[in-house]
Curated annotation (Swiss-Prot):
Compartments, record wording: Cytoplasm
Phylogenetic lineage: Bacteria, Pseudomonadati, Pseudomonadota, Gammaproteobacteria, Enterobacterales
Chain's gene name: rnb
Enzyme Commission number: 3.1.13.1
Segments forming domain RNB: 189-516
GO biological process, one term: mRNA catabolic process
Protein name, as recorded: Exoribonuclease 2
Stored InterPro entries: CSD (IPR011129), NA-bd_OB-fold (IPR012340), RNase_B_OB_dom (IPR013223), RNase_II (IPR011804), RNase_II/R (IPR001900), RNase_II/R_CS (IPR022966), RNase_II/RNase_R (IPR004476), RNR_Ribonuclease (IPR050180)
Amino acid sequence: MFQDNPLLAQLKQQLHSQTPRAEGVVKATEKGFGFLEVDAQKSYFIPPPQMKKVMHGDRIVAVIHTEKERESAEPEELIEPFLTRFVGKVQGKNDRLSIVPDHPLLKDAIPCRAARGVQHEFKEGDWAVAEMRRHPLKGDRSFYADLTQYITFADDHFVPWWVTLARHNLEKEAPNGVATEMLDEGLERQDLTALNFVTIDSASTEDMDDALYAEELADGRLQLTVAIADPTAWIAEGSKLDNTAKIRAFTNYLPGFNIPMLPRELSDDLCSLRANEVRPALACRMIIAADGTIDDDIAFFAATIESKAKLAYDNVSDWLENNGTWQPENEDIAQQIRLLHRICLSRSEWRHHHALVFKDRPDYRFVLGEKGEVLDIVAEPRRIANRIVEESMIAANLCAARVLRDKLGFGIYNVHTGFDPANADALAALLKTHGLHVDAEEVLTLEGFCKLRRELDAQPSGFLDSRIRRFQSFAEISTEPGPHFGLGLEAYATWTSPIRKYGDMINHRLLKAVIKGEAIARPQEDITQQMAERRRLNRMAERDVGDWLYARFLNDKAGTNTRFAAEIIDVSRGGMRVRLVDNGAIAFIPAPFLHAVRDELVCSQENGTVQIKGETVYKVTDVIDVTIAEVRMETRSIIARPAA
């Protein structure tokens, strides 16, 4: 009799609309209960039985119950699941399989089965890619997943690489494909094979993108010719190889090995500017005045070159610093190094005064054994030879940015607009408290930004610099010319790494159109989005593999008294993050390790400081000694404590 009663339906509707609800993200804890985080200030308790319906990270709507003045959340509707596609470790065997997601806060095994068409017979310990198929908040009885791809077996030494690449859905190997012959592009190539071009790279580099040649003119000015490998001489736009490169967007450099954007036959051989091999190149010739200014008379042209020497950064640096035993093989090569060194010094000086120069940070290189074991991690400082190449590349990219802007009005540009305008007032206020006075309007201009950066670089420590970093905007890839505040330049378009960056291949095609005086279409916007997304994924993959290798490397130091110098890079409510100076590993120091009495301890992310009893004891950029307390292999996290 109540079945179709409109009054009852109305009452139900009323009760439903009057029941308080909240939307937020589920945060799990290790104790079985959880919280619904609505915003930074408000969260609701989720009791353990209700947590069985949801997963850490799910965005849900929950009904809020109040009992004895205690609020709790009952999950009601799924807005966005945290897990869709994920990687994990398989448990069980044959017909009763489950998978534990590889995530620090997801500990529960999810029942699963092999998806249709997946031939592999899964067993305990296998790594797999899975996709969620059922969720309790979608009316299903429980969570359930399909195993869509086998990654590797439990004891594979290369688990960090294969699992990370599968997690980010990135390619595991070089693309297939061959380029049989060079295209007829209708370009006149200048024969520069007689000139003493040299390449300077790491000793192990095979994909040499750039060769340099310098000469002194009669009036004392220096002329620099930058010759860049020419993959677009082999790869036609829209071809299969081109489309593959477009999807990959970059060569993916991981510790221990790389996954190239182009087939290795091209990247490491046909296009690589190997010593004593004749190669096609795209070249830029510029004249540099004594003060480092680049003359307006910039020439881009197609060429044929033959590198006369494959030089290594360390050898060249040692020679310029009068160290070591290495010598250039002849006077011609020695003269090239001297001239390139002069260009480097004058360009560096120019950038100090008219643009911005990054502080040198070391690169960390993993030395790996046959089985992927970490034998050592070496900090490689950026030396004078690295700077010679860097200054030449920045100059060449600045030239390309100008030419593409003036001749076409578009290209693939790296654009960075400095500070987000919404943050300008807060930034000025923060700087004022530290005795630096800036105009909130002026700091949004390229000149104002450069002026501030120079003042910050002159500070005794990097503390203030670290505080304002959160106000900065991110660098973007754009088809529209625009300034690059981070470099302090009016425009910046890279074309010097076409073997490893698809955007540089596009700029090559645009520059060739300029050389031939032909019209060419503006690149599609979606390509810049693809490049930005791939750059993000590649960086995450590099970080994930690094975390895994750092955990392996430091595992035997856990619980020992071995001390490491560590720079504080971040402070949060829960503690501090530090970077070990000698090897680059990131470790976390939990707040209880800083001071035992919680009420006397204030960890402020806002100020970048840790105070004990009102005294600032630690701040971001401080370097302190730490020991390794614990290494958690399953989450690849390193826990440190201040050394006693």
